[in-house]
Structures are given as C-alpha cells and as structure tokens.
Amino acid sequence: LLGDAIAALRATQPENAVLLARQAVELGLDDTTVWGVIALASRNMGDYRAAHEAADRAIAHDARNARAFVVKGDVFFAQNNPRAAAAFYQRALSLSPLHPEMVQEIRVEFLRAQTRLQDLQTAFSDHMTREVQPLLDDIDHCTPRMQGAVDLLLGKRRLYYPEPRHIMVPDLPIHEFYPRDYFPWL
C-alpha cells in the first residue's frame, strides 16, 4: 500500500495517496515514510491541519526528516505565519543543504524553501530597517552599541565569541575589539 501511495503522490493524485497511506497506517505501518507521504499529499491538497499533524508524526519518528520540516514551513507560509515558516525552512535547510546529487523532486522543494526563506529574511530586514532607521538617524541617541545590535538582528554581522589561547578571564564582557580608550597605558 505504501508503494502505491508514493506512486499516487508522484502522479499528482494526492487524494489517493492520502487514502492509501492512511490504509497502511490502519494496517499497522507507523513510520516516518508513511507520515511523510500523508504530510506531502495533505499539503498538496491544501489540508494544512492534516499536513501539520502528519509532519509532526514524521518528525517524531525521525527528528532529522528535513522534508517534514519543509512541509511544516509550507503550512505556516500558507497560513501567513512568516516567522514560523522561516524557522522551519531554516531547520530543513540546515539538516539537508542543497547539493547537485539531490533527487529532482526533493531538490525543487528545497529550492522553493530556500527562495521563500530568503524572501522572508529580506522582508523582515526591510521591515526592521523601516521601523528602526528613524531611531538610528537620531545621532544624539544612537550609540555604536545600538547600531551593532541592529546589525546582529538583521544578520549583517555575527556575534563574536572569544577563543582565548593563554588565559580566560570569565567576567569580562564579550567585545570583538575593545576600544583603545579603555586601556590608556597601551
């Protein structure tokens, strides 16, 4: 039954795929593949509640099932929840980065996820820039620390963690480069 469900899914017959996969579940098959088929077919039919639940079941069986994370991202994207969609797309792409040897149907899904993730990140960056820019333009109140925080938030810079070689002083705050005026003897 599962093979027939996969064939129906590939033949763009999601209703048949869900029906056959659910029959396989009723017969005792309970693994990541059957729930993945149900998740993909339900998403393709627009039944986002069922797709979400099936993707959760697939992830419960295999926490590294990147395709189930893509389905969850698609569900949240369709439900206009960009924050959750971006998180699930990011997780999927970190579990299974795009590579040339990927099966074509999976590659298409991951390319879509990557494109949507980039679009969501760009929209978030534009939104934050639009909302925060007036505060940054106020030279009297905008400090380099505030500008650094905004750059971290927008992904323009990464947080630096020191990697001491000789001695570690645990109570020092983390600064990428300490300002020279803190050390007048240098």
Give the ranges of each region predicted by the language model.
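Canonical positions in the second alpha-helix
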Residues: 23-24, 57-58, 91-92
